[in-house]
Amino acid sequence: MMKAVQLCLSLAFLGIAAKPEFDAELAKRLGADERGMKMYVLCILKTGPKDAELKGKDRDEVFAGHFANIGRLADEGKLAVAGPFGKNDRSWRGLYIFNVPTVEEAEKLVVLDPAVKAGVFVYELTPWYGSAAMMTVTETHKRLQKPK
């Protein structure tokens, strides 16, 4: 009986530890290299020089444009992830992970953000090597967000 339990546990462990099946079509669609990774550009949005000056309706309009821009970039496949930082002592406000291979291409996108144009945010860009699966976040997020 004990040997049967050991055998069952061993087989269960082997099933858990089995390598996942490689999906060549998915890897190609997401632009993955042989490690399942790809180059992105990481953008840190920081508090800009005009942040404190923009108030009321003007601020609301800038942020409405900021969020619309995020949605557009995500829908176009140019943005893997975006989101705000919690309170911190670095003036970091948010991040973007752009699905573009160069800093120059990312800069062309970030300067279109209404909050950057208005001086609410300034930005820093750097190349970042991460999982190509990052490109599945937007679709998954849409299934998690409750409709308004």
Where on the chain are the PLM-derived regions?
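Sec-dependent signal peptide recognition
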Residues: 2-10
